[in-house]
Amino acid sequence: FASKNNLSLNFKNPFKNFTVNESYETISWYLTVLTRWFDYNDTFLAKEWAHPSDNFGAIFSYFYKNDKYKFIDFANALTKAYEIQGSLCLGTSLNKLGYDHVFYVKIASGSVFSHLVNKGDANATRRTVNNILLDGPSLRAYRHFPNVGKRKSWAAADASKRGIELSIISSYQDEIYESVQNEDKWGFETNFLDNSELGFGKDLNNWVIQNVLFKVLFPAEFHGQSAVEAAIELSDEFNQNINKLEKVNIYTHEPAVRIISNKDILKNASDRDHSLEYMVAAALLYGDLKYEMYEESFQGFEKINNLRKKIFVTEEPQFTKDYYNFSKRHISNSIEIVYNDNSISEKITIENPIGHPSRRAEAVPLMKEKFLRNVKSIFDTEKASEVWDKIINLKKDDNLNVFFNILIENE
């Protein structure tokens, strides 16, 4: 996509690639892809799943080209996008009908961008949302065997870019398509949702952005993060008794069974980081989980593949109830090891992985470590820590130029 948009990529500092002459769509696409590529995306789990940070590129693109604002204006716009996407996820499932969650990115990014670029014109925003409904959602087939592929890494960028395109088109006087959501024959709900209602699962405020999940320690689909933690706790015992192994039992919530329990052939790393059995096998064997463990070139690849065949996943109904309980929102997993002499290890249960709102205090220092580790080829530790601290200490009334200068001045 870089050559298509005539960008000269600067991986030391991607923000140096942009000028105010770049289109909103280009900036949004680029940053949304990079957020996923570098694994900085957050997560929100409900009836539908989401990475609300997928909206960052679209919101950033507007303020980067229109920087006479305060930091609080940027933060408020981002909060609105998070709230729209997350509340839709609480209200209506797309995945059960085979559609991908990035459709809600298109709605959230498109509607907030429209509000910004059209200076609060309600009709323009209505046109934007209804044009997005007319587009419809994409299939999520590229996230599942046998069609897993790299599209899952750029699907959100595509959605945010399209949301911006439709918001700009909708700036012009045109039909609003008032009844497209619920019209009986040709409407969105009739044709895409099997007559279910598209709606918010709660009142809109700022709750979603305060309750996202941060991927802190492990490169794994979030429904399996607590299982990886549990497996690491059992790793020493597992390796001491590996010759006695009969099987490994995982007890989990229904969404994990449906999404990431996969003992089939795993064709690539994208398949493997969405296999509960694979990630737990790696964590049991090596007491950790790193990106390279998903690659066929990893020296322990065959060991992991052989072990996952002995891992069995079962739904624990209470975990499913706690997953959907609005006051808990647990992402629980239990693991036990069964040996061939009929003995069983301690069952390790982790209700919420690091990165869950209930463990925020543990997560923030680890997030800083992740940042320092990921930029060590560019900045020394002192410089990286300085960049982190400057961003964390931004004040709401700071001019946005202060924010942008932090990003641009560091080479």
Residue ranges and their predicted role:
Residues 1-48, 147-161, 168-411:
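Terminal-appendage/accessory-domain detector
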Residues 34-76, 80:
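Long, structured ligand/cofactor-binding scaffold of large enzymes
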Residues 35, 54-56, 64, 83-84, ...:
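Short connector loops/turns at beta-strand edges and beta->alpha or beta->beta junctions
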Residues 50, 54, 101-105, 270:
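Hydrophobic alpha-helical transmembrane segments of integral membrane proteins
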Residues 53-60, 105-112, 160-165, 224-228, ...:
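Well-ordered alpha-helical segments within folded domains of soluble proteins
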Residues 63, 114, 232-236:
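Generic structural signal for well-ordered alpha-helical scaffold segments
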Residues 64-161, 165, 180-185:
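Glycine-rich, mobile lid/loop segments that gate access to catalytic sites or pores
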